[in-house]
Amino acid sequence: MMKTSAIHSPFEAPNTISLVAGTGDANNPLNAFDMSLLESGIGNLNLIRISSIMPPKAAIIPLPKIPQGSLVPTAYGYQISEVKGETVAAGISVAVPKDKELCGLIMEYECIGGKKECEDTVRNMAKEGFEMRGWEIDEIISIASEHTVENIGCAFAAAALWYK
């Protein structure tokens, strides 16, 4: 049997997670994306895109006040469209294990379509991820955004990890 050793890293794992979502519409894709970040409350942070693992025992909290310019580990999904009248959506879910020694799963999804379809899909993805691991779910939380494009539109959803 393989012995597990402690993780040695210069970085401490974040101990909080916050779900946020926003939308934007602008004259170009980057500004639409930026507007969606601003609406979600994380537009003045440097997002470091991470894979979909929530550190064990991380607390799910409302977005704290994070200093501008901070490097923030973030899992996110976004959908941009330039088709006027098209509806775009993005969602994120977090599955929390019953066994608090295990990590949680963060799933992100984006689509051409509505918020309900997106949120249902991202919640099912979290369930499937736990089934693949043989773990029991304590709870799943999720958030999604939806936007009907006027010029160039973006829907965005994220899980921002931070520290207490």
From Swiss-Prot:
Q: Does the keyword Lyase apply?
A: yes
GO BP terms: namely: arginine catabolic process
**Gene Ontology MF terms in the entry:** arginine decarboxylase activity
Q: What's noted on cofactor binding? A: Binds 1 pyruvoyl group covalently per subunit.
Superkingdom classification of source: Archaea
User: Needs which cofactor?
Assistant: pyruvate
Chain positions found as Pyruvic acid (Ser): 52
Sorted UniProt keywords: Decarboxylase, Lyase, Pyruvate
Q: Where is this site: Cleavage (non-hydrolytic)?
A: 51-52
> What Enzyme Commission number(s) does the record list for this chain?
4.1.1.19
Q: Which Pfam families match?
A: PvlArgDC (PF01862)
The catalytic activity, as recorded, is: L-arginine + H(+) = agmatine + CO2
Record InterPro entries: Pyr-dep_his/arg-deCO2ase, Pyr-dep_his/arg-deCO2ase_sand, Pyruvoyl-dep_arg_deCO2ase
Tell me the protein family, please: Belongs to the PdaD family.
> What name has this protein been given in UniProt?
Pyruvoyl-dependent arginine decarboxylase
Q: Which organism is it from?
A: Methanococcus maripaludis (strain C7 / ATCC BAA-1331)
